[in-house]
């Protein structure tokens, strides 16, 4: 898949072929290296490539998985689940993973995770977990930046190109239906680009524009991956993000800017 990126040229999105079902303990960087070699038209890797890896396979490889049959839900989780036809055990896992509960009403549970992400269900997810997914859920990786860094270092060692890596996940957005992929971990790029103080196309100085470039790349990759196609990894070629040793924490808005709390 390719799209016109305007003045920056053309952006290509290449989904990797042959990534197998990931299980806990798998050497994910090595598996991704094998998939890169198998994907027609991908090699040689280029300096303007960005590797986007979906959270689910990172979590599975790192054994960030909970067996719901081992969970004893608290009364609050049971009451919420019974009222809104939810699984009390999954609600309990979400509450355990939460730094704080932002909203818990009308069947919706929005929390702040220990990473600082504010999202539905704290990133706890029962989809695409594997053959026994009826009683398993995945958690977000403990340190998504570290996960991205390990993949980046392995790719650099194997292919000799320092390719930035994004770990992506699907988030909702306030006041809009639907989900889109965003970056939850990065290595080798700066997740946001502060354009304040630079002139726009008409010469006016921009005063508030901060570009979420890592989120844009993660969302672009999802166009080639899809939610049910079984393709969890893509190369986004030509996006040209701002390179550097950034952290996903750079993209998290401080609490004092919260207008809805």
Language-model segments: which ranges?
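N-terminal and secondary-structure boundary signal
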Residues: 1-261
């Amino acid at each position: 898949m390719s799209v016109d990126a305007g003045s920056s040229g053309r952006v290509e999105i290449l989904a990797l072929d042959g990534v197998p079902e990931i299980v806990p303990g798998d050497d994910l960087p090595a598996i991704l290296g094998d998939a890169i070699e198998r994907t027609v038209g991908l090699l040689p890797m280029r300096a303007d490539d960005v590797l986007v890896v979906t959270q689910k396979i990172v979590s599975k490889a790192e054994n960030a998985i909970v067996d719901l049959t081992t969970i004893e839900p608290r009364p609050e989780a049971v009451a919420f689940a019974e009222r809104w036809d939810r699984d009390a055990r999954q609600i309990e896992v979400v509450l355990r993973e939460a730094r704080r509960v932002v909203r818990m009403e009308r069947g919706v549970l929005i929390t702040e995770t220990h990473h600082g992400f504010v999202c539905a269900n704290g990133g706890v997810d029962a989809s695409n977990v594997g053959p026994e997914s009826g009683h398993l859920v995945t958690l977000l990786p403990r340190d998504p930046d570290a996960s991205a860094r390990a993949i980046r270092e392995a790719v650099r060692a194997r292919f000799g190109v320092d390719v930035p890596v994004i770990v992506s996940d699907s988030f909702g957005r306030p006041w809009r239906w639907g989900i889109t992929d965003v970056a939850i971990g990065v290595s080798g790029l700066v997740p946001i680009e502060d354009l304040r103080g630079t002139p726009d196309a008409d010469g006016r100085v921009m005063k508030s524009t901060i570009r979420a470039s890592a989120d844009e790349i993660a969302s672009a990759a999802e166009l080639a991956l899809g939610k049910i196609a079984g393709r969890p990894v893509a190369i986004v070629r030509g996006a040209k993000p701002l390179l550097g040793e950034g952290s996903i924490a750079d993209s998290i808005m401080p609490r004092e800017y919260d207008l809805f709390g």
